[in-house]
Amino acid sequence: LKLDFVPFWVSFHLGLWVTTLLLVICFPLAWVFSQAKGRWVPWVESTASLPLVLSPTVLGFYLLLLLSPRGRIGQFFLSVFHVRLAFSFPGIVIAGCIASLPFMLTALRTGILALPPHLLEASYTLGKGKVETIFRIVIPNMKSGIIAGIVNTFAHTLGEFGVVLMVGGSIPGVTKVVSIAVYEKVESLDFGGAHLYAAILVVVSYLGVLLLNRLQRQERRR
């Protein structure tokens, strides 16, 4: 069986971009959500969790409308940065970020809420500001939450299908990820090829979960 490694590279590249961007975007959001107590918090949290319950096809359809040259976001990127989002790698990165946002946000928020309150209180009592407290107290003591967010987000992005297909199509070397390669193999009745792609994806995902559990156990022992 001939194995094309390009879809794996596209998937890995996509997972790396999505995970990195979401780590940067979601940490301040998780911090605000964990500290805020306003009536708006449940509404914003529910909105951020929508990708968990929405069908990937439905989510992908609306994202395609937004990211197309006639959509507001797509039109903005095209006119300002001269970047076409629909059926392009930058487009599936944005779509992947939205689809995987709940995985990173939930893990980071849980990690922040699990911190003993006295740690933050002691830091503020010693005259430390919020930024210094975050970098010296919060982040070093919530490594388990950060690791969970990274692994869950990366694994989910690797297996993403509906959103990527709707927004990016299946352009070899650009938007054709492993899950789409599996679908195309099945569609062409090449079950041997589909098994090969799927098996590798299962192994990679399993190793990711195994790594997550091991790192979390090590963190708890400390």
Where are these regions (language model features)?
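Interhelical loop and adjacent transmembrane-helix boundary motif
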Residues: 1-6, 167-210
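Transmembrane alpha-helix signature in integral membrane proteins
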Residues: 4-33, 52
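Alpha-helical transmembrane segments of multi-pass membrane proteins
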Residues: 9-17, 51, 131, 135-144, ...
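Transmembrane alpha-helices
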Residues: 20, 105-108, 116, 130-163
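Cytoplasmic-entry segments and transmembrane alpha-helices of multi-pass inner-membrane transporters
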Residues: 32-65, 120, 134
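Membrane-helix interface segments
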Residues: 36-44, 72-73, 88, 130-131, ...
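C-terminal transmembrane helix and the adjacent membrane-cytosol boundary/short C-terminal tail
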Residues: 40, 109-120, 124-125, 137, ...
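Membrane-interfacial helix termini and adjacent extracytoplasmic/periplasmic loops
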Residues: 60-97, 167-171
